[in-house]
Amino acid sequence: METVITTTIIASAILLAVAALGTALGFAILGGKFLESSARQPELASSLQIKMFIVAGLLDAISMIAVGIALLFIFANPFIDLLK
């Protein structure tokens, strides 16, 4: 039983790390492309900014979902019931 709990906590930590890394890379690429495109066409900067914030919200949702799944696995582990 302790093995299942330990493995679940390690998997949750890896899940959180990968989600944070993916979100950070996504924000870096998004910000770079936004600055590049608004420098090329300054008249489209306002419409590009709106689209950037929409995509930023979707990027943030990825890490929030990962945190929710990790908390589910840590505090309400569904795999422990399989051992009983």
From Swiss-Prot:
Gene3D superfamilies: F1F0 ATP synthase subunit C
Membrane topology qualifier: Multi-pass membrane protein
Keyword Cell inner membrane attributed: yes
Lineage: Bacteria, Pseudomonadati, Pseudomonadota, Gammaproteobacteria, Pasteurellales
CDD domains for the chain: ATP-synt_Fo_c_ATPE (cd18185)
InterPro entries attached to this UniProt entry: ATP_synth_csu_bac/chlpt (IPR005953), ATP_synth_F0_csu (IPR000454), ATP_synth_F0_csu_DDCD_BS (IPR020537), ATP_synth_F0_csu_sf (IPR038662), ATPase_proteolipid_c-like_dom (IPR002379), F/V-ATP_Csub_sf (IPR035921)
Gene: atpE
Major subcellular site: membrane
TM region positions: 9-29, 54-74
UniProt organism field: Pasteurella multocida (strain Pm70)
Keywords: ATP synthesis, Cell inner membrane, Cell membrane, CF(0), Hydrogen ion transport, Ion transport, Lipid-binding, Membrane, Transmembrane, Transmembrane helix, Transport
Record function comment: F(1)F(0) ATP synthase produces ATP from ADP in the presence of a proton or sodium gradient. F-type ATPases consist of two structural domains, F(1) containing the extramembraneous catalytic core and F(0) containing the membrane proton channel, linked together by a central stalk and a peripheral stalk. During catalysis, ATP synthesis in the catalytic domain of F(1) is coupled via a rotary mechanism of the central stalk subunits to proton translocation. Key component of the F(0) channel; it plays a direct role in translocation across the membrane. A homomeric c-ring of between 10-14 subunits forms the central stalk rotor element with the F(1) delta and epsilon subunits.
Protein name: ATP synthase subunit c
UniProt-annotated location(s): Cell inner membrane
Family: Belongs to the ATPase C chain family.
Keyword Transmembrane in annotation: yes
Any one annotated GO CC term: plasma membrane
Site (Reversibly protonated during proton transport): 60
Molecular functions (GO terms): lipid binding; proton-transporting ATP synthase activity, rotational mechanism
UniProt signal peptide: none
Alphabetical list of Pfam families matching this protein: ATP-synt_C
Subunit structure: F-type ATPases have 2 components, F(1) - the catalytic core - and F(0) - the membrane proton channel. F(1) has five subunits: alpha(3), beta(3), gamma(1), delta(1), epsilon(1). F(0) has three main subunits: a(1), b(2) and c(10-14). The alpha and beta chains form an alternating ring which encloses part of the gamma chain. F(1) is attached to F(0) by a central stalk formed by the gamma and epsilon chains, while a peripheral stalk is formed by the delta and b chains.
